[in-house]
Structure formats: C-alpha cells, structure tokens
C-alpha cells in the first residue's frame, strides 16, 4: 500500500484570490478612465489635423467665416479650434448612471455643448469630430489591455 501526504496552500490561494477580487473593480475603473482620456486625446489630435472621426477631411469654412478669421488674424485651416475653449472642455468621466465599466465623454460647459452640437449635427456641412471608428476602438482596447496587464503584474499574484 502506498501512502502519500499532500500539502496544499489553499489558505494562501484564498487570501490572494480575495485580494484580487477586492482590487479588480478599482483597477478596471482606473483603466476605463485612462481609456477615456486616450479617446479625448485622439479626438483632439484628429480635430487639430482637420479630420473627422472617420479620418475624412472637414468641409471647408464658408467664405464669410474665412474673411472673419483672416480679419482677426486667426488660422484659416478647418480645425474647429477658434479659441480652444470647446475642445479644452471635453473630459472623460466614469459615472455610475452610465453603467458598470463605461466611460462617458462630455463637455463641461453649456456653451461648449452648444458649439459641439452645432458642428456635429446642425451645421451644414457637418463636421463630425465627436466619435470614433473601429481603428480608434482597437487602439484604445490595446491600451486598456496593456494597462491591466501592467497593473496585474505589479500585484504579484
């Protein structure tokens, strides 16, 4: 007859599992907020380059608006950066109302919401800067995955 004694570290494993279970929701929220900041940066960068969220160039400004910009000494490139106020007011947040594991991008002031709505929806031609395509989504997803891997490795579980 063969006898075998097996030692397990189940208590240590339980302790590590509980620690992971406790920290994981905060790590996910932090990663999602970071993804929100990355999306804001991508939107600002594309807009500054004069391209919409689908990587198409913005429609040109009207002649009247171009004359106004020239008179004021402002750049005439179509980049939606008249004063920088609208794009500066774009911020990400994790609001519990939107649901778990979601980030929301919003403008912080009503006047900037109105400007963005005008450019995105009402203006003809539309200049759709507020959104993202499949390529942008993949970039953000890779960034989130890298962040989570770094954080989990740092926990040494």
Report residues per predicted region.
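Short, Lys/Arg-rich flexible segments
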Residues: 1-157
């Amino acid at each position: 007859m063969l006898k075998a004694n097996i030692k397990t570290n189940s208590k240590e494993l339980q302790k590590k599992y509980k620690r992971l279970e406790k920290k994981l929701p905060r790590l996910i929220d932090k990663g999602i907020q970071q993804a929100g900041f990355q999306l804001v940066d991508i939107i600002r960068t594309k807009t500054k380059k004069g391209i919409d969220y689908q990587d198409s160039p913005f429609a040109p400004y009207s002649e009247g608006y171009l004359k106004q910009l020239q008179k004021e000494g402002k750049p005439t490139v179509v980049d939606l950066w008249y004063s920088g106020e609208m794009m500066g007011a774009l911020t990400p947040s994790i609001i519990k109302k939107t649901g778990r594991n979601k980030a929301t991008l919003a403008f912080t002031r009503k006047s900037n919401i109105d400007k963005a709505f005008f450019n995105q929806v009402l203006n003809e031609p539309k200049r759709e800067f507020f959104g993202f395509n499949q390529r942008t989504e993949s970039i953000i997803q890779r960034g989130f995955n890298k962040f989570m891997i770094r954080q989990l490795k740092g926990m040494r579980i």
